[in-house]
Structure formats: C-alpha cells, structure tokens
C-alpha cells in the first residue's frame, strides 16, 4: 500500500481536535460485516435518538456512504418469495474510511464528535503487510473503544466449526494484546454478534449466545481479565439484528457458505438493537465525564461536554437505555459503565 495513504490518515487524526472526539475502531476480518453494522447503526440511531433531546449531524460524506449501504441492505428484501435478492448486500471495503457524526442538543451547535473508523478486514490477516498491520495497531491505540462484529452463524452452528475461519478470534486477540500494552487509560471493548436473528428469536439459542461468545473469544477475554487491564477495560456483549426479518437457513457441510431466508414473503428491512453499541459508548463516556481525577484522559472527556449540563443530562438519558439482560452482558468493567458513580 502506498505510503501516502498512511500519511493522509495520520494527517486526519492530527487535524481532529481530541478534546471533542470519541473514536471507535472496527476490528474484524474481511466479510464479517463491519460496514453492514455501521450502516445499520446509523439508520437505527436516527429513529431512536429522536426520543431524547439530542441531534445527530452526520458529516455529509459519511451520511451519503452509509445511506447508500443501507439501500443495498434494503434491496435484499425486494424479491417476492423467501429467498433474498442474491445481488444485493454490501461489498467488501477496499480502503479505510472515517465516519464522523456530530452530537449535540437540538437547535444548538454540536459539541461532541463521534468517529467510527472502518478499513479492509484483510489488513489484520496473515497476508497483510507490515504497514497495514501497523496502521491498525496505531488506530486501536488511539481509539476510545473497539467494536468487534461477530458472524453469529459461524459462531453458533455446528459447535462453532467455522468460527476460527470466519471471525479470526486469534487475530483479534493478537491485535488487541499488542495495542493495549502499557495501557494507562480506560477503554471499552464491544463484542457484537450480527446476523443473529435466528438465535434471538429462539429462547434456547438466546441463552446459549453469551456462553458461545465467551468460549469463542476465551483467549482475548482471559487476557483482558488480569492485572491493570482488568482495572481499565470494560467488555460488553451487544448483539445486533442487522436485518431483522432475514435469518440463517443453513450451510453446506463441507464449507461455510451460509444461506439466508426471509421470515415471510413480505418481510421488510427492520434492524433491531443496532443502537445498543452506541448507547454503551455514551454510557462509557458519561462515566468518564463524572470522574474527578485530573489525569489528561479524564480531563479530555470532561472537556468534550464543555460544561453543558443540559447536554449531559440528555446524553445520560440516552446512555441509560443499555440492555443488560441475556444475550446482552457486561463481562467486566461495570465500574466504567456505572453512570451514577463518581470517581475520586
């Protein structure tokens, strides 16, 4: 990859005012659904946040891209029968992209910027070059949160036979392990099973999902649960039904090639819980804002809200909508998600 691509990214990072930006990095292999999750989150967010005195103002380019991706997801439902449109869906990402959203009170200038960074999943696999791998490491180190999409059928079916191949948990573990060396400030890690409609509509599967995530990411979770990492990192499971009315319907026995079906011929695009990762992010930010410690990181978080108590209350109200019952779970770091607690 040409050096100028990396230089451009670093210039963008330098230009953004860190006092106003919460950065979230996607982390997952190619084809796992990182961009689909972002598009679904953006679409659902506008519908959910209307109930709070908050407004989201996507930067124009980000809105255009995610809207186009949402249209492609909607096209999956354009057929008359149960088989989705096989030509629709989202193509693999070919380059990195930052999706920026400004958050503020309705009718006021935005005071907080959320930045979600997506990139080709191939940049974390064994064929990636040293520049790509270093790029991802730099991004993870500079991010306040990491969002890890998980292909749920690969995790859940046939005792997780295809999980390692599809979700690459060892690659995810190694990158986070390297990125969080000598960590000194809190971080949030969100494990987000997607394409999980079949399992969340079946009580037996639903109860099994948390256990399967913990088993499938046992190296990562074990590493984060010791010493200073345990004290600094919050880890949550937040599944997202990215389509709503399309479910996993099987795969050939000899390879992972999943087939999906609409739940009914007139099924429609109706994602569910796709705002939950953002609710957890805001809950994390609100907890840090309440912390009175004077270290640089906590000061930066407090400066994001600029003493706007009205915005703080509205953001806090939105953040308290986090789901915590199974299959949602806080695995560690509850203290970094307790918005009622004040630091010392």
Summary of predicted features, one role per range:
Residues 142-317:
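Conserved GTP-binding G-domain of TRAFAC-class P-loop NTPases and closely related GTPase folds
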Residues 2-116:
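Conserved G1/Walker A P-loop phosphate-binding module
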Residues 5-9, 16-26, 46, 50-51, ...:
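C-terminal non-catalytic interaction/localization modules
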Residues 14-17, 136-139, 180-183:
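Surface-exposed acidic, glycine-flexible loop patches that form ligand/cofactor-binding
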Residues 87-147, 155-161, 170-174:
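Switch II of P-loop NTPase G domains
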Residues 20, 33, 141-142, 185:
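Residue-level preference for short coil/turn positions at secondary-structure junctions
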Residues 28-30, 103-107, 120-123, 197, ...:
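Short, flexible loop/turn elements at secondary-structure junctions
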